[in-house]
């Protein structure tokens, strides 16, 4: 209700309520780059690290570089997700956009694996082991 009031339109239970824009400016960029794929706030850090030329282990960062060639994907806590070609609303069990059964089933498995990995990271204190291994 608050989101609807602030946005000036009714969203109900729609993933559209999460849409936003991101602008990154750098004086060293020769020309503007426009990215038209879905991304999330967790994708900002790896994107900035890439733009700054910083070395990092991408396996240890949850987000993905927005400027990479990888397809866009945004996951939500209820296992809903948005790809560059379709949206899946887990609460309603609805799909908006065209997707084959094979692609949808594969993405469902991928999303389930991501949530399993996230749960395991949390339950085992994975990053404390990484910090110990790296001597930090």
Role assignments for model-derived ranges:
Residues 1-136:
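Solvent-exposed soluble domains appended to multi-pass membrane proteins
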């Amino acid at each position: 209700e608050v989101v609807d009031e602030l946005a000036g339109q009714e969203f109900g239970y729609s993933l559209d309520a999460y849409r936003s824009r991101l602008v990154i400016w750098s004086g060293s960029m020769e020309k503007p780059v426009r990215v038209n794929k879905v991304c999330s706030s967790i994708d900002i850090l790896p994107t900035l690290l890439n733009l700054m030329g910083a070395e990092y282990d991408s396996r240890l960062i949850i987000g993905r570089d927005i400027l990479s060639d990888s397809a866009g994907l945004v996951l939500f806590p209820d296992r809903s997700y948005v790809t560059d070609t379709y949206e899946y609303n887990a609460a309603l069990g609805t799909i908006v956009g065209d997707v084959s059964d094979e692609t949808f089933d594969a993405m469902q498995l991928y999303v389930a694996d991501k949530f399993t990995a996230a749960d395991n990271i949390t339950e085992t204190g994975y990053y404390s082991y990484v910090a110990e291994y790296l001597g930090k």
